[in-house]
From Swiss-Prot:
Lineage: Bacteria, Pseudomonadati, Pseudomonadota, Gammaproteobacteria, Enterobacterales
Name of this protein: Ureidoglycolate dehydrogenase (NAD(+))
Reaction it catalyzes: (S)-ureidoglycolate + NAD(+) = N-carbamoyl-2-oxoglycine + NADH + H(+)
The species this protein was found in: Escherichia coli O157:H7
GO BP term, pick one: purine nucleobase metabolic process
Locations listed in the record: Cytoplasm
Site entry (Plays a crucial role in stabilizing the binding of (S)-ureidoglycolate), positions: 48
Keywords per UniProt: Cytoplasm, NAD, Oxidoreductase, Purine metabolism
SUPFAM superfamilies, per database record: L-sulfolactate dehydrogenase-like
Catalytic residue list: 116
Pathway membership, UniProt: Nitrogen metabolism; (S)-allantoin degradation; oxalurate from (S)-ureidoglycolate: step 1/1
Length: 349
């Protein structure tokens, strides 16, 4: 079924307020979740609300966080987020990074002790809309076997990038460092669909197509994805003095406790390196040239990274956002959550 962006936003916001989140914070979380669903990233959209509601109601997401911004240098800062909702903390951290980069050319802002922040391309697009280049990366709970390994160590540790072209054009790139994000498995479960056997392994280490049998995810491109997730864990965890590797908290164990996750934003002002106008012209030229490339057999069009999601987002603004009926029924119900997510860590060793 399809519903309007405004309706979905209000339903999510109301449910999170029902769980105890203040209206301002609930609106921000809803904004990021609706953004994800509108772009077809259903793994990071409304499917997450029931889990968020349970964690908020049990105190694992701080309803009254005390944010503290520590400016550690002219271009660097740490936002101590007090286990606030991750979307709220990440958006706030990016706002500071944008101001710093506008003045000083570059900014590096770490967000320390936060919750799950959802689709992190939302935050790099904040920078791009301000005419800046945005890069963001964050930790995730352990659910991935390292290349060549049989035990879980790292999370999906996503990485996102966005840069402005001419007008309102934005080039966006957002990826998990696994073949697919855990949320894609959750989405497959909600739709009763199988998954490709290249995404994950079962408890015996064998490839599986059953999303309910997933025990561990696989790194993207083997050793390359493994190296990227290691780098992201270092920059968003070790660098900020936070738990790292398999010490990162599980999304599903003890929903009464804060996640203590880390995220790192890097923002670059093109005007400090060349000309913002020239940069934007060349980026738009890149996008047009990629679209003009002859497609390979089996493809109708070459898209630049993120273009397919841009198209879906524009369509959603007109046609509405696709949502699974079970999720819609939950959102309009009085239930805070139907099935507890606590202690259901599918990656427990």
């Amino acid at each position: 079924m399809k519903i309007s962006r405004e309706t979905l936003h209000q339903l999510i916001e109301n449910k999170l307020c029902q769980a105890g989140l203040k209206r301002e914070h609930a609106a921000t979380v809803a904004e990021v979740l609706v953004y994800a669903d509108a772009r077809g990233i259903h793994s990071h959209g409304a499917v997450r609300v029931e889990y968020y509601a349970e964690r908020i109601s049990k105190g694992g997401t701080n309803r009254e966080p005390e944010f503290r911004l520590e400016e550690t240098g002219p271009c660097s800062a740490i936002l101590h987020a007090d286990n606030a909702a991750g979307q709220v903390a990440a958006k706030m951290g990016m706002e500071h990074a944008i101001k710093t980069a506008q003045q000083n050319g570059v900014a590096v802002v770490g967000i320390s002790r936060m919750g799950h922040s959802g689709a992190i391309s939302y935050f790099v697009q904040q920078a791009a809309r301000a005419g800046l280049i945005g890069i963001s990366m964050c930790q995730s709970d352990p659910m991935v076997v390292p290349f060549g390994g049989a035990e879980i160590y790292y999370g999906t540790n996503p990485l996102a990038f966005a840069a402005p072209g001419e007008g309102d054009e934005i080039l966006t790139f957002d990826m998990a460092t696994t073949v697919q994000a855990w949320g894609k498995v959750l989405d497959a479960r909600s739709r009763n669909m199988s998954i490709p056997d290249t995404w994950a392994v079962d408890k015996n280490g064998a490839p599986t197509t059953d999303p309910f049998a997933v025990h561990a995810l696989l790194p993207a491109a083997g050793p390359k994805g493994y190296g990227l997730m290691m780098m992201i864990d270092v920059l968003s965890g070790v660098l900020l003095g936070l738990p790292f590797g398999r010490q990162v908290s599980s999304m599903y164990d003890d929903l009464h406790a804060g996640r203590n996750l880390g995220q790192l934003h890097v923002v670059i002002n093109p005007n400090f390196f060349s000309s913002s106008e020239l940069f934007r012209q060349h980026l738009s030229q890149t996008m047009r040239e990629l679209n003009a490339i002859t497609p390979a057999p089996g493809f109708n069009q070459v898209y630049y990274p993120g273009q397919d999601q841009d198209i879906k987002q524009r369509q959603a603004a007109v046609e509405g956002i696709e949502i699974v009926d079970d999720i819609y029924q939950y959102l309009i119900s009085d239930a805070l959550y139907n099935t507890s997510y606590e202690t259901k860590n599918p990656f427990a060793q």
